[in-house]
């Protein structure tokens, strides 16, 4: 169930951190710290550097987010 008040943006993974955390550079020029959502974790979807991802941001803290989807690129099928 998707929450209504979340901000969804696209970006590129720039750094992989411990505990399934990633630094994501968003299309608007901001950089956020994001963790993986439960569905991605459960389905063993790998997030690598330079992957394009969709990130949900809370309107209360725009520096942290949740990666909800890894977008397809030409190189990964």
Swiss-Prot record:
Q: What is this protein called?
A: Translation initiation factor IF-1, chloroplastic
Q: Give the record's GO CC terms.
A: chloroplast; cytosol
Gene of origin? infA
What family is it from? Answer: Belongs to the IF-1 family.
User: Entry's PROSITE patterns?
Assistant: S1_IF1_TYPE (PS50832)
The organism's superkingdom is given as Eukaryota
Q: Name one Pfam family in it.
A: eIF-1a
Transmembrane regions listed in the UniProt entry: none
On subunit structure and binding partners, the annotation says: Component of the 30S ribosomal translation pre-initiation complex which assembles on the 30S ribosome in the order IF-2 and IF-3, IF-1 and N-formylmethionyl-tRNA(fMet); mRNA recruitment can occur at any time during PIC assembly.
Q: Where is the S1-like domain?
A: 1-72
Principal localization reads plastid
Q: What does this protein do?
A: One of the essential components for the initiation of protein synthesis. Stabilizes the binding of IF-2 and IF-3 on the 30S subunit to which N-formylmethionyl-tRNA(fMet) subsequently binds. Helps modulate mRNA selection, yielding the 30S pre-initiation complex (PIC). Upon addition of the 50S ribosomal subunit IF-1, IF-2 and IF-3 are released leaving the mature 70S translation initiation complex.
Q: Where is the signal peptide?
A: none
Q: Name one GO molecular function term.
A: rRNA binding
Please give the SUPFAM superfamilies that the UniProt record associates with this protein.
Answer: Nucleic acid-binding proteins (SSF50249)
Q: Which PANTHER family match?
A: TRANSLATION INITIATION FACTOR IF-1, CHLOROPLASTIC
Q: Could you list this entry's UniProt keywords, alphabetically sorted.
A: Chloroplast, Initiation factor, Plastid, Protein biosynthesis, RNA-binding, rRNA-binding
Cite the HAMAP family for this sequence.
IF_1 (MF_00075)
Localization terms from the record: Plastid, Chloroplast
């Amino acid at each position: 169930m998707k929450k209504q008040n979340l901000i969804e943006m696209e970006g590129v993974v720039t750094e992989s951190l411990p505990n399934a955390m990633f630094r994501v550079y968003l299309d608007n020029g901001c950089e956020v710290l994001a963790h993986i959502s439960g569905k991605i974790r459960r389905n063993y979807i790998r997030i690598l550097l330079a992957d394009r991802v969709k990130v949900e941001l809370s309107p209360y803290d725009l520096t942290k987010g949740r990666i909800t989807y890894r977008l397809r690129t030409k190189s990964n099928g």
